[in-house]
Regions:
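Inter-lobe coupling/hinge segments of SF2-like helicase ATPases
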Residues: 1-170
Length: 170
């Protein structure tokens, strides 16, 4: 608990879609989702920056505004870049640099729905480590992924809360 996540999308429309869906999913669980774009100005922007710096905002969704100098994260642990091919090396490094004041570097997840040939991807993203894990560590139980219809959301939330109350991972 107390860690933060930043999700950066290349357009305000895509970022807003992510924001709206994440608010719908996470705010009922008590997770504060922040919306940060270049169009947010003045007192509203300062209030949002304060929530990010204090750690009150656990998930920050935005566009390039997420990597501006005045955005300071309290405990950034995960940076997600959607449509990663739309951002250059400099933007990815700026997002990672948000943790220079801490002893650890955030995990970086890059997503894209655009098929990029493997050779081009390996050339374009040569600054990144790529690993493939194709077996479980000894003694590890396989993860079971389940998909539920949206009309069962309350049931899923209740089950997650029960598991967390028992001290289990979810």
């Amino acid at each position: 608990a107390g860690w933060q996540c930043a999700l950066m999308a290349p357009t305000e429309i895509l970022a807003e879609q992510h924001f709206r869906k994440l608010v719908q999913w996470l705010e009922p669980l008590g997770v504060r989702v922040a919306w940060l774009t270049g169009s947010r100005k003045g007192k509203a922007r300062q209030a949002m920056l304060a929530q990010i710096a204090s750690g009150e905002a656990a998930l920050v969704v935005g566009i390039h505004a997420v990597i501006q100098d005045d955005v300071v994260f309290a405990r950034l642990a995960l940076a997600i870049v959607d449509e990663q091919h739309r951002f250059g090396v400099a933007q990815r490094l700026a997002l990672r640099a948000k943790l220079e004041h801490q002893a650890l570097e955030p995990h970086l997840l890059m997503m894209s729905a655009t098929p990029i040939p493997r050779t081009l991807a390996m050339t374009y993203f040569a600054d990144l480590d790529v690993s493939t894990i194709d077996e479980l560590p000894p003694g590890r139980t396989p993860v079971v992924t389940k998909v539920f219809a949206d009309n069962r959301r309350d049931e899923v939330i209740a089950r997650i809360r029960d598991e967390v109350a028992r001290g289990r991972q979810v």
